[in-house]
């Protein structure tokens, strides 16, 4: 990839990773418009790592409090709201880990297509709208509970299908289960940390063993740009949903799905 392509794709990834609009749907548009080839798994991991750094730094105080409380719960048997939240995040991670191992090759081979992404972009956009309009939305992140956490975890596993949007699927599930918009977003952001970290480690291992050359300069640039874009995105997204809800993102998903369908069928 040339530098321009790296910048554009990293910006897209960083700006869309934590919005409920599907980063994979946006990453396929440059390929359709400009004839770019698939950026490959190594670049996906690089820009996802940049996004991971962004959420860790943005929520550093919450994550540190959760980590200390989690350790205390195991060493001293002391349980607090933060330790419970940490355990719920771990529990919510398990479905994605399991299905990621089981279905990784199938997804890469059969579901990474424009048609699948177009359909899931629209369908899960409508589900997000329904959840935002019809649900209670009055629970805080500390009222999630292990049952709700596990169900949100299964939604995250479903988001392994390209176009679904990890943040979109998890926020939809959280809203359906009664979490407030802010709580749904924060739980979704926090549960992205272990999944993204695990995926980066696993794929990084595969890349290290691969005989193919790796463009480390492009990967580093992509990571930095994705980090900056994702950090700003998290900050402003939390402000937007408190004022306007999810409707702007639902409308955007429907338009994006229609555009993708246009590229496919016209």
UniProtKB/Swiss-Prot annotation:
InterPro entries: UppP. NCBIfam families: PRK00281.2-4 (NF001393), undec_PP_bacA (TIGR00753). It comes from Shewanella sp. (strain ANA-3). This is Undecaprenyl-diphosphatase. Disulfide bonds: none annotated. Belongs to the UppP family. It comes from the Bacteria. PANTHER family: UNDECAPRENYL-DIPHOSPHATASE (PTHR30622:SF4). The chain crosses the membrane at residues 1-21, 39-59, 87-107, 111-131, 149-169, 183-203, 218-238, 246-266. One of its GO terms (cellular component) is plasma membrane. Bacitracin is thought to be involved in the inhibition of peptidoglycan synthesis by sequestering undecaprenyl diphosphate, thereby reducing the pool of lipid carrier available. The keyword Disulfide bond does not apply. One of its GO terms (molecular function) is undecaprenyl-diphosphatase activity. It catalyses: di-trans,octa-cis-undecaprenyl diphosphate + H2O = di-trans,octa-cis-undecaprenyl phosphate + phosphate + H(+). Catalyzes the dephosphorylation of undecaprenyl diphosphate (UPP). Confers resistance to bacitracin. Keywords: Antibiotic resistance, Cell inner membrane, Cell membrane, Cell shape, Cell wall biogenesis/degradation, Hydrolase, Membrane, Peptidoglycan synthesis, Transmembrane, Transmembrane helix. Pfam families: BacA. One of its GO terms (biological process) is peptidoglycan biosynthetic process.
